[in-house]
């Protein structure tokens, strides 16, 4: 970056903003890069600004009980704010004085007033000087205020980030990532541009007072008629604004609903294609879009009338001011023209400036209050440690989720004793509730000495991670003691990767030691992976390690923890994503050898790890089930596995575990006795409650894709609210958990940033804490979305006791990754969305405009109609002018004066004919602007265009090949459907309408002036030419700067989300200062771009104004020097010239806005033009001899499965299959050939990342493939894609449940009857689950079906496959996140429902492979072995290495016995389970 020319710029250069000249020249000639941007001045650096504000905020906290952020801001910025306010006021005063001089100039042309004619030229000079002074005052003032707003935003951004790093885990559990981003973007962007309007809250009233005084001098009391009318217009506009908000609020829910389904579709596009659900998804989204557009139209009409009211008021305000005075006393022309000029300024002050200023203050103070409350939240308390301690000791430790939870529970139970629950089963609710009242850990005791390994085991939700949290100080015990040295290293359960190189991720700011680094890389099995990258360990990883596999991320995370030299290593299930072989090697070489002298606590569920541990701690429902050695465990607790896991059978699950499915259901229905109708629930299931108590604006951002554990209540093993630390802070600064009054107003204080009422706790689902505790699959890519459940509207308890219930329900609500926008709204749209770098032309091309206009044929007719109406208006005006001029000449010729007593009354003066002209001037802009027949059809048609474009884009996305999605970020696709479609719906129609209106007003005024004074036309031509050249020159650079600014905004939010996801790791490693520095760097980069954009914008605005001032000077002097007698002509010319000046500037700005918004259109066209999948057969098929398959030829690309005979058996032949993710990319699989007999079961084996899942995708033609596959003799080249995919049933690794009913999820095309669905649900063990929900099959699942465990979702995928009657079943790691019970159900279903199907299974678990007859071993992109289990066990294969000798002995007998013995299902299930316990993760 270069040094900014601002630092050495002269005063003149700063005053006229000529210092950004070089960058404008460069941007016009060539493409701007980041290196071309100037460095920021030191006064704008985030370090300086945040330090200044932090100092004042700390002062505020120290000195007052009730600290106010606005006081800290005042001490930092107040005097500069006042100075710029005064400049702004002086600039505005000149506008009020201009009409006075105008009046005097007009008066000097009165034939009776020849005395003043001599000073007309001096009056004109005075008028022109006023314009020059105004230009010189206004622009520096506005720029100064924008600059100051930017500084305030930077300081607050930094303060919020620093606070986020200090928040206690308990507070983090109450805040969603959506709220954090919303706090930064939606609230803080108000300061950047809003500050310039803030002063009008006092300037506008002063301006109105001054103007009314001046108009009173002219018209006496009748002046107030015009003001009264303007106030009525302003109030009317406020009413219309409220009506518009009402429509938009209604629409917000629909937009949200559409975006949720769209993001689910994009995120799971692979599943959508695998299931052939493209048409079903399109229909669902289009139906929602229809409803949304109806509301969009209504809102647009209201907004159109609101906009038209401003123009329309121009004529009436003058008319109402002048008419009463003229009727009573008569009026001279000078007064009319002066009044018109005064009224133009008055109208702006009353209907625009003052309402905007009030809105700005309202928004800004609201934002400051939210930030203030956030800054006062409870902080993470660093524990005091004894550095000399070598042991790790826990004595009688107990911890609760919430302080005082037990008491709250008792109170809630008493208050609800007599209430009926909607399904009438009281026990369900309270069995869950008692669980929630229990401590997360109770009476934990253990002691481990230096160098020992403690293995912590237990079922999901037993409190394993909470134990590690407590050691780290994230969760404070309510009783008991913890002792250790405090030198901790931590490896999280779900690997966290920061943006940077692999090396930076492992070293993580610790000093570099080559030998240690190499040892760690070797022990964590990373050598081979690193050697594959061209840049080795210096390869830059994207957000969340997007380019790495899950196993690679897990190993880097582990390497980071091991590299740090600590006394105690906390490893939270570090092997979750590793294959058996890698896990075994890392456990031995890293955990047992490399770290042998260190104290380690390992959360695990593997029997081998328990055997090798020095001590074992088994947790069950928060209590210590067992503590001791492995031999003691076998002696004392021989039944530990079945007891802990509930292996005996599903029915013998503990009540808590079984009912976890129901807990969210209960939240949806009122406990008050009146049941809520199902339809109502359905309506509300997408409704978003306000995010911060008042209208929350949008925030849609890329987030993570959560995978959920089996239990809903105990699902995160992390329960991490923490306990309220004993804080020295005053009570007001801490979160109050218990309401002050019995009425239970809110859980947090009223002004709290995140919660202004009890609704928040019920509707929170994805807290920041959950974000930290979820695994990420393609973290940076996957959009995660959340919609509120109906719980947001239905209380769980009577209103008075809501607060206690909220705490209960918050614990239940876990899953989801993101707050989807409450309202897609105006300028905020641009804030939160960050796109990849796109090669967009600097200025929107004419081709885009032409294509946009021709999208809908009626748009062309509407535009032609607009032009016709306009030409008619201009023609009428010219005719009127001609008639007036003729009558004026006749008047002069006859030299007659009409008597005041004649029928005309007192209005008529000796310049009567010109009086009529005033009506034209007054009505000119009203007539052009209102033109209701022109405006409404335009807005209506532009919304139709938006509808068509959305439809085309959706179809294009659904038909795009998977390679497109491999190169496109999901966030970018969702931005098209959210940000860009919202721009097309909301901003573009009205901005375009405004631009067309303003342009026509200017043209109309120029024509009138030119007719009256032809010389002026000569001055107009160069002005218009200058304006066009200047606009083109400026646009080239400004759009590039905007693009760079948008790209620079992305790292700020990415860094925030990344920091929050890795917060425990950050704090365990003490890296907060390093991350604050990185955040400040990201802020400074954004500031450099934004400041330069603001400066170039001011450069442009000032140049435009200078051109207009020159134009006005020319017009004034030409008029004065060439006009003869008669005040009418000079009055019209000067009044219109002043009007042209203001309007043309507005028109120029509108044209820039239109160009900017049209970029959204060009982005959408890019998506519409994407290539599509080849759905037609690649070659024709010869009719088979037996005639059986002839019907294949006539199946068209229909999604409905017809009962033809293909596929009949499921015989599959693969020949020379090669697969790539993208065209021209490296082959992921090469020359794969094998054959599978009908009904055979084949297991895929291979290390992590060997290509097993890729092979399954290749079967479905989801990749770029070469070679051939045949099913029952039919080649994939001979039939359509849809038909081919229909042959397969799929259970993907990433389960797809979209927002909709159970029925829709199982059968989106609605082909099956209820009986068929229930029969299949019975077969797969889903019936009992579905029947527990109200509405049964019609129960609406939202948030990816968060009320279901991962196992139940897998069962739904299984049911889909059974319903599709597929002959070949593909299973991609179905047991990865399953508890043993659900896994057994899946195994049983596979045996029964798919007995005669071909099954291809990809698995990590050895025991999962027991049913397979053949095994396909994939290594180095190709088939290494394809054989039966016996041969693989005899040879030296990967399969043989992966399992222990003991298991090897078991495998063959197990297969034989299980195939030949017949026994009852339950007995078989039980026996199999017990045999497998050795391998199963607890």
UniProtKB/Swiss-Prot annotation:
GO molecular function, one term: chloride channel activity
Keyword field contains Ion transport: yes
Region (Interaction with GORASP2): 1388-1482
Lipid moiety-binding residues (S-palmitoyl cysteine): 524, 1397
Chief localization: membrane
Transmembrane segments: 78-98, 123-146, 196-216, 223-243, 299-319, 340-358, 859-879, 920-940, 992-1012, 1015-1035, 1097-1117, 1132-1152
Bias kind Acidic residues: ranges: 1472-1482
Residues bearing attached sugar chains per UniProt: 894-895, 901, 910
Biased composition (Basic residues): 1454-1463
Classification via SMART domains: AAA
Quaternary structure and partners: Monomer; does not require oligomerization for channel activity. May form oligomers in the membrane. Interacts with SLC26A3, SLC26A6 and NHERF1. Interacts with SHANK2. Interacts with MYO6. Interacts (via C-terminus) with GOPC (via PDZ domain); this promotes CFTR internalization and thereby decreases channel activity. Interacts with SLC4A7 through NHERF1. Found in a complex with MYO5B and RAB11A. Interacts with ANO1. Interacts with SLC26A8. Interacts with AHCYL1; the interaction increases CFTR activity. Interacts with CSE1L.
Similarity comment text for this entry: Belongs to the ABC transporter superfamily. ABCC family. CFTR transporter (TC 3.A.1.202) subfamily.
Protein name listed in UniProt: Cystic fibrosis transmembrane conductance regulator
Species of provenance: Loxodonta africana
Gene that this sequence comes from: CFTR
